[in-house]
Amino acid sequence: MSAAIDWGRMAAPQADGYDTEVTLRLATTSSSPLRPDPYRRRPVDGAPTLFGGRVAVRNRPSGGLTPPRYAPASPTHPNLAAAEKLLEAWPDIAVQFPQLIDTIQPWTDTTMTPEFWLSVPGSSSHSLEDEFGIIMATVDSPIGLAQALVHEMAHHKLRALGVSLLQASRLVTNNPEDLFVSPIIVNRRRPMTAVLHAQYSFIHVTALDVALYDAPGASEDQKRHAIYLLARNVPRMEAGFEEIEAHVETDAEGAVFVAAFMSWSRAVLARGREIMDANGYGIPAL
């Protein structure tokens, strides 16, 4: 099947849904060492839902984000619907998300107050390779949750395309024992597959930040939060861009995919810089 894939259209979300269709086809017809069975969409089974009844919201039966800091949140927490609404700022993602994701597992950070999240938006989140379609995320901040949803969806997509966190079956050919600087986990070097995962997921986050700022009718609070998040994300994504550009090794398909990803990234980061500069948040690139 991979020979028929237009890898130049698989990096950024496509308006016609091409990348969504291919990702689902790969997820439902293939496996990986960490996902031994092909994906089968989980039924809603009466759970509360988002995205027009397509995405179930239910608490995780066991495991998940680590207690006591994190505790299960209500599946009807109002920030879930608020985050869904925020994704509408990026129409291609708003359409793609409920096709690739079937379950959101909500959590809360017990160490932070509601007032904290009003000034410092964010979310803790996680997803597992053997659970394609499931996202765990804290719901305390609507914009932070929206970021977490696209962040973890991007991880799921990249895994389905053949790039796991520590190894790859296609696209990336770097030796897993060779380590590089991650734009996110900065205290230790990581395999190139992990660096690409960090960059790919957070470019999605950064693109959402740009979309939230540029959205017609965006409130001043939404713009303020988007600027704050861009100031946090753009410099480290610029550093990650340089690390990947200098060191990634690919097969023929990966060369096309990475070129398309870097082209999209360049446009996202350029717009992010413009927004920061226009609002007095311009800071030196790392």
Where do the language-model regions lie?
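Short, charged/polar micro-motifs that form catalytic or ligand-binding hotspots
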Residues: 69-73, 135-148, 186-198
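N-terminal low-structure segments adjacent to metalloprotease catalytic domains
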Residues: 1-59, 281-285
